[in-house]
A protein has these predicted regions:
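A domain-level signal for the structural core that forms small-molecule/cofactor-binding pockets
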Residues: 1-150
Length: 150
C-alpha cells in the first residue's frame, strides 16, 4: 500500500494562518494526491501495447497531513519547512530508482508552485522511497491472509 504524507508545521494548519497567508495544507495534499495519480512509468512488460503505466494504484494510496511541532530550520524559529514523503513497494516491476527520482522532482515542483512565496518557508523537501517487504513491512491484508492460512 503506497503512502503519501505531507509534513506541515502545526501552526500553519490553523485557520488564522490560512486566512492571513492563503496557504491551505488540505488543498495542497489533495493536489498532491492528483499529481501522484498522474505519475507514469515505463511499462515493464515486454511488447505490451501500453508504453506507460501508473506508478501507483490510486485506490490503494493512503494519504495524510502530519503536523510538526517545534519545526524550525537551522535553529531559527522564524524559518519553517514542508516535507513530502511518498512510499511505494519496491516489488512492482519497473518502479526503479530513476522513476522515484523523477517522481520526487515532479512532486517538489508542484509544491513549489503551490506555495509560491509563503512567508517563513525556508525549505521544501521530497522523499520518494521504497517499501521493502523483506525488511519488516507488513499490511493488514497480508497478516489476515497469513492467520487464516494457518
Amino acid at each position: 500500500m503506497p503512502h503519501l504524507r505531507l509534513y506541515v508545521p502545526e501552526e500553519w494548519l490553523r485557520e488564522d494562518f490560512k486566512a492571513s497567508t492563503g496557504f491551505d495544507a488540505g488543498r495542497l495534499l489533495d493536489h498532491l494526491v492528483r499529481v501522484v495519480a498522474d505519475l507514469r512509468m515505463e511499462n515493464p512488460a515486454p511488447g505490451a501495447p501500453a508504453k506507460e503505466v501508473p506508478m501507483i494504484n490510486l485506490s490503494n494510496l493512503k494519504h495524510a497531513i502530519v503536523p510538526l511541532t517545534h519545526a524550525h530550520v537551522g535553529g531559527d524559529p522564524g524559518q519553517r519547512f514542508l516535507h513530502v514523503t511518498l512510499a511505494a513497494g519496491n516489488d512492482t516491476p519497473g518502479r526503479t530508482a530513476s522513476v522515484r527520482v523523477r517522481a520526487a522532482a515532479v512532486l517538489g515542483d508542484e509544491v513549489d508552485r503551490f506555495v509560491g512565496d509563503l512567508p517563513g518557508l525556508a525549505s521544501v523537501t521530497v522523499h520518494v522511497k521504497d517499501i521493502d517487504r523483506d525488511r519488516g513491512y507488513s499490511t493488514t491484508a497480508e497478516r489476515k491472509k497469513r492467520r487464516s492460512a494457518g
